[in-house]
Structure formats: structure tokens, C-alpha cells
Amino acid sequence: TDGRSFDAKVVGTDAPSDLAVLKVDGSNLQTLPLADSEKVRVGDVVLAFGNPLGIGQTVTMGIVSAKGRATAVGPANDSYQDFIQTDAPINEGNSGGALVNTQGELIGINSQILSPSGGNIGIGFAIPANMAHNVMTQLIDHGNVRRGLLGVSVQAVTPDIARSLHLDNA
């Protein structure tokens, strides 16, 4: 908001988490302390910062609606499945903005909305700060994110599957 502009160097990107680490050389840059996002509780008051629809910086208020939410968005639906859900309005342009608790600590990074119209209907998702910190650390240390892969997927057991596996019920 002070009108300064900086060039940034891309340190690393991670498509599955939709996160990147950028290096900016500057002075008097403000930072946010990271909260332990595991300690976030449903009902906690949160503030969502961003630039919705390109109108300029804004802050909206809401609560944490749920934790551990999954979305079906991302390359081959492989996006992380541990989002913080909030009803703080997150609209197009808020992605990458901060989701902050009332102590001014970063609890998440605004990432997605779930909406049939593309506008906010009170279902927004943020990447938890702990996950973002893990991705950031790996990008800085290794240039990429290392993940384990089991080669297993989960699906509901339907009556047809139950019969094929000789199960008593689905």
C-alpha cells in the first residue's frame, strides 16, 4: 500500500499445494508471525486479506467453519485435502492473501472458493499455515517438495463392491 514495487526471484513452486516461494530484496518489509494451525478451532474469528476482483486491498471477517476439508480442485484432483474452511468472504483475487487470527498471526493462505457462480457464497478454503511452512521449507532447502506416495486411493464401498468382496454390508 506504500506504492513500492519490487522484482522477485522465484525460489520454487509446488503445483499440488498451489504455493510458491519468492525472494524479494527490500527494506522495512512487514511480516506476519506464523500460528500453529493445528491449534485453530472451529468457531475462531478470522480475517481474510486480499484484493478481491482487483478493487484494491480489503479485509473481511468470518469464522473458521471447519478443518480438514477436502476439495476436488487441482491437477487430477490431487490438491491437498486438509483445508481450513471459512465463511470470511474470499472472492476471485483473494487467493494468496492471508487468513489471520485475532492475535494477528497467519493461520492460513486463502486458496479457493466453492461456488456454482464463481462468487462468494460463504465457502472459502485456506491452506493451513503448518502445511505452507512445510512446503516453504522444502522449497528453500531442496528446490522441490518431497512427498510419500502409497499408490492407493479411497472410495466408498457400494452395495455392488460389497457383494463382489463377499461383505455382509456396504
Residue ranges and their predicted role:
Residues 1-170:
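Serine-dependent protease modules
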